[in-house]
């Protein structure tokens, strides 16, 4: 009798165990999906540029409160912008191989929950930055609106120059870091914005060349779709040359020293080298290689900026 009861309970026990396993594995997946919506790797890069802006804003070490609250606030706002981008692009994402598996595109997270999540991050970030100063709070909010609304809703679908115009919002973090520490605008901070702004088109156009068919299928007027791949390659090369010139400005204005001049020149020449290969070498892999190099290029460029600043501070 006991044996038969045990056998009879086996399916129930198995079901309970399966349910427990499902619950234990589904929760981490949900949290991973929410994290995915914030584009953590992109946010990390933005925070690095913001941190460099903070450090360059003052001769010595910036105030701990400004650094901590500034990075948290800018991070929350950047994550909110990314999450709003997921919400607004959820239908478009289903048509592209690069984005079809995103949480909202796959229906793993309900739209209203994503909106609440993004709104919460936005409000928290704004309040934290207000604790520092109103200028940083409102500039960061303007950047969020510029990316999540102006770029995602309008520019992305309106013009092949979407990346150029919309790049202003993505180039703001160094300025935001600067104002978080000083509470005021400075021409040197705008130079940092110019660096990221000039870097943005060749970075994204290299990706757009690699994913041209995806963008064409989704009806997004990226430059390779509207003007062709060869024209876009030429523009990538042109912008890398422009970036080399803009990259000299921090040294020419006395903002940075010789360490930066050498480091940035080598990095920018490397970018030009990749752009030349992209333009003249007959290989489909060069677009992706150029895109990957551009990521490390920006990270290294800002590390060189920071290193030069600290070396100069120690010497003088």
Curated annotation (Swiss-Prot):
Q: What are the BP-aspect GO terms?
A: heme O biosynthetic process
Provide the transmembrane region boundaries.
Answer: 42-62, 67-87, 115-135, 136-156, 163-183, 189-209, 235-255, 256-276, 295-315
According to its record, what are the GO cellular component terms? plasma membrane
* Reactions catalysed: heme b + (2E,6E)-farnesyl diphosphate + H2O = Fe(II)-heme o + diphosphate
For molecular function, the Gene Ontology terms on record are: protoheme IX farnesyltransferase activity
The entry's function note states: Converts heme B (protoheme IX) to heme O by substitution of the vinyl group on carbon 2 of heme B porphyrin ring with a hydroxyethyl farnesyl side group.
Name of this protein: Protoheme IX farnesyltransferase
Native species: Photobacterium profundum (strain SS9)
Q: Which gene encodes it?
A: cyoE
